[in-house]
């Protein structure tokens, strides 16, 4: 007989820490979408009408989890804009290849530099995105990164 221990959740990765923010940007890499989905559901359930940008990087469209859930959220959250970037999808007609500073600058060009930014994904992606965001004028105190690797 096996035993399973469940512990947590831990940490403070939440949009609620930025209650004064008028705009949110969520940047996720792969399964880093998990906490973003939870926050978006909370925002939808509470009738949040702030401007939201979700930038989600995946290898291919087949790696997009729960597409129906995101369509439903987009219908509920009128301020939500979902941007996909595919890193390994040569046939994909949208944004392709890994995120880099020029792509991030272009994709977030209409976002306020005082927006709250939440980032979750692979370590190197989060490090790079943080540095690019700061270099693009986003406020350090408004950028929050969730590291989930050990």
Model-derived features: where do they sit?
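FNR/FR-type flavoprotein reductase catalytic core
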Residues: 1-150
């Amino acid at each position: 007989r096996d035993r399973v221990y469940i512990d947590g959740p831990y940490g403070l990765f939440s949009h609620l820490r930025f209650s004064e923010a008028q705009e949110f940007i969520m940047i996720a890499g792969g399964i880093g979408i998990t906490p973003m989905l939870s926050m978006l559901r909370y925002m939808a359930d509470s009738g949040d009408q702030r401007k939201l940008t979700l930038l989600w990087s995946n290898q291919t469209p087949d790696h997009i989890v729960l597409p129906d859930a995101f369509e439903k959220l987009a219908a509920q959250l009128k301020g939500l804009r979902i941007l996909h970037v595919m890193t390994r999808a040569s046939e994909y007609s949208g944004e392709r290849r890994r995120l880099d500073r020029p792509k991030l600058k272009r994709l977030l060009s209409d976002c306020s530099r005082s927006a709250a930014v939440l980032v979750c994904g692979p370590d190197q992606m989060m490090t790079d995105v943080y540095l690019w965001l700061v270099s693009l004028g986003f406020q350090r105190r408004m950028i929050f990164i969730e590291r989930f690797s050990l």
